[in-house]
């Protein structure tokens, strides 16, 4: 009978393990900002500006949604204006047909 010597083969890592981290991800972009430009004609209900908080205030014929989104109440031309010294507002002025 043949007797075979079996080698005791053990493999070890030749590099340290990578470990884990609590970083390495990012949130989805929320697509905030101006959705209509100054001088642009919009219809009633059109979104003018998406924001968190009141970065820009609603002016004439502009409403503010529950998430502070500004929208046009009537069809007209968009105007971004100053409100006092340090605030801005957006208004929609109807055009004569």
From Swiss-Prot:
UniProt PTM: The N-terminus is cleaved by ribosomal processing cysteine protease Prp.
Record's keyword terms, sorted: Ribonucleoprotein, Ribosomal protein
A single MF term (Gene Ontology): structural constituent of ribosome
Keyword Ribosomal protein: yes
Chain positions covered by the region annotation Disordered: 14-37
Alphabetical GO biological process terms: translation
Propeptide: 1-12
Annotated Gene Ontology cellular component terms: cytosolic large ribosomal subunit
Entry-linked InterPro entries: Ribosomal_bL27, Ribosomal_bL27_CS
Taxonomy, superkingdom: Bacteria
Family according to the record: Belongs to the bacterial ribosomal protein bL27 family.
NCBIfam families found in the cross-reference section: L27
HAMAP family noted in UniProt: Ribosomal_bL27 (MF_00539)
Protein name stated in the entry: Large ribosomal subunit protein bL27
Gene that encodes the chain: rpmA
């Amino acid at each position: 009978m043949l007797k075979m010597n079996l080698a005791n083969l053990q493999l070890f890592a030749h590099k340290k393990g990578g470990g884990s981290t609590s970083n390495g991800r990012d949130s989805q972009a929320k697509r905030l900002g101006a959705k209509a430009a100054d001088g642009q004609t919009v219809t009633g209900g059109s979104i003018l500006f998406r924001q968190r908080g009141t970065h820009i205030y609603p002016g004439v014929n502009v409403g503010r949604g529950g998430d502070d989104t500004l929208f046009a109440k009537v069809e007209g031309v968009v105007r971004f204006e100053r409100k006092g010294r340090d605030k801005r507002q957006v208004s929609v002025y109807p055009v004569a047909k």
